Every structure is written in structure tokens, then in C-alpha cells.
Amino acid sequence: MELVITGSNNKVSVSDAVFGREFSEDLVHQVVVAYRNAGRAGTKAQKTRSEVAGTTKKSKKQKGGGARHGALTAPIFVGGGVTFAAKPRSFEQKVNRKMYRAAICAIFSELNRQGRLMIVDAFDLEATKTKGLIEKLKGLEVGKRPLIVTEEASEHLYLSARNLPYVQVRDVQGLDPVALVGADTVVITADAVKKVEEWLA
């Protein structure tokens, strides 16, 4: 298939397997959830009744009409331990390479179908100026949350976008499913398209 390069009459030939794939919501959801879970610290920790600080001496006598209690570290008391205490753990989920790449292809294909994929000849700035980047994005009409994808990282582009909270800049190597799904429009250079095809082929 061929896609039009924005701002010119030129077209770029792309693979149907990457940009014309059928969308699978289940697959994309699974990969996005796995990617987000892999970023979790997993450091949550609580103390059980055996770990909380406090005496284990019986708090009151056995007889006398009240409820029977032992140590004040029991979960029933304020300041006591937690019954099913959370412990540090990994939230990582295994995702096969084939599944991951298929999900990326499905996302690119859906972006293309929805008209949210914009291909440009080049996307670079002569100087590190946030104002210059804003003007360039306004000219392209990319929406509030654009994702700019280049073949290789550009320092001018990265530093110019750093002060814009909803603008993301990635090179092909740094692409991930969460960034692609969350973008209103993906602006990608023609060279980056070729590199994406090499990666996902």
C-alpha cells in the first residue's frame, strides 16, 4: 500500500503487514497492560502481626466478662498487624516477541485507518526553541497530544518538546504501545517508517 507524505505530493510504499493489519483489541489490551505492569515498582509492603512492633503479652486477664484477647499486635486492634499483608512482588507478565510486534503493527494499522498517522519528509529544528516546535505543530494540526517519531534521536527536537507536557518525542528504538495508543496523532518521518518496517517485518 502507499501512504501520502504530508505537505507534498509524494507517496511512500509501506507494508500491508505493518500498516494494513486487522486490529485486535484483545491483543493490544494484553500488551498494553503487560507493558504498564512491567513499569510498576512493586515495593508495597505491610507488616503482619508477627512483624509489627509491640509486646506479645496477654493484654487482659482471661476471665471477667469481657472478650478474650491476647497480644495487642493482633489485626483486630488499632496499631496491630495486617491480616493479609502486602509484600513486595513483581507485576511483570510474559509477552512473546511475536505478540508484542503484532500488537505494534495492529496499533499502527488502526492509527492509519483513523487518519491519525501523519507521515512527513523530515521533522527537525534548527535550534532548541519550544516556540518553534509549537508553531510547527500548529501548522500540521496534530491535536493536543501528538507523538513525534524520528529515525534517530534529535537533541534540538527533544529539548524543545521537554517543556510541553502533552508532546512526546521518540526515536524508533524508543517506541512503546502505551505511547502509540495515548497519542491523538502520530507524526512519523519517512525514514522512520522504513526503520519501523525493518523492525516489525
UniProtKB/Swiss-Prot annotation:
Swiss-Prot/TrEMBL keywords: Ribonucleoprotein, Ribosomal protein, RNA-binding, rRNA-binding
Quaternary assembly: Part of the 50S ribosomal subunit.
CC per GO annotation: ribonucleoprotein complex; ribosome
Protein's GO biological process: translation
Lineage of the species this protein comes from: Bacteria, Pseudomonadati, Pseudomonadota, Gammaproteobacteria, Lysobacterales
Region span, Disordered: 44-68
Domain of life: Bacteria
Functional description taken from the UniProt entry: One of the primary rRNA binding proteins, this protein initially binds near the 5'-end of the 23S rRNA. It is important during the early stages of 50S assembly. It makes multiple contacts with different domains of the 23S rRNA in the assembled 50S subunit and ribosome. Forms part of the polypeptide exit tunnel.
Family: Belongs to the universal ribosomal protein uL4 family.
UniProt-listed SUPFAM superfamilies: Ribosomal protein L4 (SSF52166)
Species the sequence originates in: Xanthomonas euvesicatoria pv. vesicatoria (strain 85-10)
Protein name (database record): Large ribosomal subunit protein uL4
MF term (GO), any: structural constituent of ribosome
